[in-house]
């Protein structure tokens, strides 16, 4: 467990701590900029290959496309649990099973779901879960926290 000031810092720390030069990462088009920006920077500066699984017309993750993209040699799969763009939830246990089948790590952005959705890291097979204490869990921040 690692406490950071916010989800953006947690996601940046996790992504930069796991991904190495030349690695391959799979993510989705449903991600927040706190995932996309560090991945884009790693692609530009560290020769990291970043693949993006799409979604259907209703904004739901295309699991078939994700499974095609998650191949041996994939270092990490970075995925949201609930999209801030579409509001759709992602079956993170299903994603974790795909990732672990090829030896990839799973980094989950649970900023929109932690505190309101059940997340069992062990049962779901999640390696890293990042979230904020100010949403869903009703933790106050600042001098009155």
Where are these regions (language model features)?
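Pyridoxal 5′-phosphate
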Residues: 1-145
